[in-house]
């Protein structure tokens, strides 16, 4: 979970509203409860019927056998960036097999196509050697200076592709440094036109492999029509699909807002963050496709409940109350509610009742997933208690101790399991076992979350209670200044992304659904903590993005 950046309360009853130490109220209130989308049910039905016709036409046009490799690479990338790939998974899978098996002809498509092929294959778990970039390097090993200004699209593709590096790939370190420097220079001089200029600016903030796919789709649909070789069929389908998926998201957000309002008003914990809209934005950044509706609902509801528990441990409960809350969670039985202080009893009862509802929703052959879910939730409470003990004792952990605990308190292992609970048959028992064991990839995803979070806290000058974050812990242990320690944590963050990349290409493909959840959660965190903000705790920082993604009418039909 995101850290609670306010001072601990020591009373045993909720604080009176109005103190400087409280979180700001929701910037949305009940807006999405009453919001009426401009798309009517009837027009939505017509759009859906039109979209189905267009999908059939795309299937006919998508002839992998007749396209050359460069054309296939471009077509697959276009489908993915337009948010259409989930409708053509089998066709894309066949195309990727051919793209991986066939080499590009010499200088086929230039740097742009070579880099695009490299990125696509690695993102889909297919190994590609960095040797493909040798043709664009000089004898001394550096990249050719001729790439500086005459191929901005190629430089951008190289920059994005290089962020699929695995640990130790010096060639891609050089590629990132080279391309970033040239792209910054191009932008500062205004040497590139729209839409490439916007795409460069976006990538310099967050490289494409780490950017949330739904936001990229929102931007790219508006940009795609300005490309000379754009496909009108794909553009129309992408616009329809975006509006239809948004309509589904708005229905889900309304349902979640109603659910959250009832929960938040029932448990009466005014010290806790009221952030369901931000949670749902986070959810869509992780999984936006229609088929993951149940997974989104499980994720958002659980995130909301664990956030209430997190804030209780962090900013309000006494240490004795923390022990009692942890103990009640371990027992997982409504009859144990009496061990809790009065103000926490409704939170406990509502948590258990919501988990019962989750189980009732699951199909009989998927109910085994609840055991993993409950254990993960219980483990969260154990680790929150450990943080509370450290804070109470003013304990200065070693960096290793802090890292080990924060992997679990990041919430990513538990939330990955909760998300997979809403998947279909592609989420196997082996996937639940794998995530529950917290393997290296889950650890790396958790560390991406924690390091982004702690870099934000350092820049904001705030931390959980008086608990040191990873920046402060690293600084003390290594005798560094704060900025030096922050730079070291940023380097560790980059390394963890590379571990995520490496695991995608090495892991058993039956685990790829779980792998993708971990990667997508890390992607969503890049947006939440962009430029050192904490847009979950400080919801106003996310308001413009929420407005654009869910409300702004930017797509003519």
Swiss-Prot record:
Residues holding Mg(2+) 1: 310, 314
Free-text remark on how the cofactor is bound: Binds 3 Mg(2+) or Mn(2+) ions per subunit.
EC number: 4.2.3.197
Site (Required for the use of hedycaryol as a transient intermediate during the reprotonation of germacrene A): 303
GO molecular function: magnesium ion binding; terpene synthase activity
Reaction(s) catalysed by this chain's protein: (2E,6E)-farnesyl diphosphate + 2 H2O = 7-epi-ent-eudesmane-5,11-diol + diphosphate
Annotated positions binding substrate: 310, 314, 450
UniProt enzyme class: lyase
Residues noted as binding Mg(2+) 3 in the record, renumbered to the chain: 453, 457
One GO term (biological process): diterpenoid biosynthetic process
Protein name listed in UniProt: Eudesmanediol synthase
Organism: Zea mays
């Amino acid at each position: 979970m995101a850290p609670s950046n306010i001072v601990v309360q020591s009373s045993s009853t909720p604080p009176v509203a109005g103190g400087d130490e409280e979180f700001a109220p929701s910037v949305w209130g009940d807006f999405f409860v009453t919001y009426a989308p401009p798309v009517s049910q009837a027009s939505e039905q017509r759009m859906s019927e039109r979209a189905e016709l267009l999908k059939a036409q795309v299937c006919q046009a998508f002839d992998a056998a007749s396209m050359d490799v460069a054309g296939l690479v471009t077509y697959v990338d276009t489908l993915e960036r337009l948010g259409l790939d989930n409708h053509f998974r089998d066709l894309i899978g066949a195309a990727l097999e051919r793209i991986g098996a066939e080499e590009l002809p010499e200088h086929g498509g230039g740097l742009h196509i070579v880099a695009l092929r490299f990125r696509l294959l690695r993102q889909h778990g297919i190994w590609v050697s960095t040797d493909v970039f040798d043709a664009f390097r000089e004898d001394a090993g550096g990249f050719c200076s001729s790439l500086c200004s005459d191929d901005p699209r190629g430089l951008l593709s190289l920059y994005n592709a290089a962020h699929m590096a695995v640990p130790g790939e010096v060639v891609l370190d050089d590629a990132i440094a080279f391309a970033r420097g040239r792209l910054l220079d191009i932008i500062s001089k205004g040497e590139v036109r729209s839409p490439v200029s916007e795409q460069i600016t976006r990538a310099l903030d967050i490289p494409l492999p780490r950017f949330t796919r739904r936001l990229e789709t929102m931007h790219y649909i508006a940009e795609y029509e300005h490309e000379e070789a754009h496909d009108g069929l794909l553009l129309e389908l992408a616009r329809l699909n975006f509006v239809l998926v948004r309509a589904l998201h708005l229905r889900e957000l309304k349902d979640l807002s109603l659910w959250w309002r009832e929960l938040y008003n029932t448990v009466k914990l005014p010290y806790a963050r009221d952030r369901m809209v931000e949670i749902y934005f986070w959810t869509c950044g992780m999984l936006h496709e229609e088929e993951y509706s149940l997974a989104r609902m499980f994720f958002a509801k659980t995130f909301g409940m664990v956030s209430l528990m997190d804030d209780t441990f962090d900013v309000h409960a006494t240490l004795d109350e923390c022990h009692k809350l942890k103990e009640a969670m371990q027992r997982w039985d409504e009859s144990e509610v009496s061990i809790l202080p009065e103000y926490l009893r409704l939170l406990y009862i509502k948590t258990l009742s919501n988990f019962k509802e989750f189980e009732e929703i699951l199909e009989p052959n998927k109910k085994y997933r609840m055991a993993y879910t409950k254990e993960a939730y219980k483990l969260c409470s154990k680790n929150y208690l450990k943080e509370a003990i450290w804070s109470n004792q003013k304990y200065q952990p070693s960096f290793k101790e802090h890292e080990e605990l924060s992997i679990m308190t990041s919430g990513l292992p538990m939330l990955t399991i909760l998300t997979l609970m809403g998947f279909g048959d592609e989420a196997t028992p082996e996937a639940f076992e794998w995530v529950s064991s917290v393997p290296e990839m889950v650890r790396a995803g958790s560390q991406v979350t924690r390091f982004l979070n702690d870099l934000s806290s350092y820049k904001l000058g705030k931390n959980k209670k008086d608990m040191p974050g990873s920046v402060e812990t690293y600084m003390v242990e290594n005798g560094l200044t704060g900025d030096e320690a922050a730079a070291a944590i940023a380097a560790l963050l980059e390394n963890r992304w590379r571990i995520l990349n490496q695991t995608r290409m090495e892991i058993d493909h039956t685990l790829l659904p779980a792998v993708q959840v971990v990667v997508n959660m890390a992607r969503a965190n890049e947006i939440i903590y962009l430029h050192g903000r904490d847009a979950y705790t400080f919801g106003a920082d996310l308001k413009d993005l929420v407005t654009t993604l869910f409300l702004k009418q930017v797509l003519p039909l």
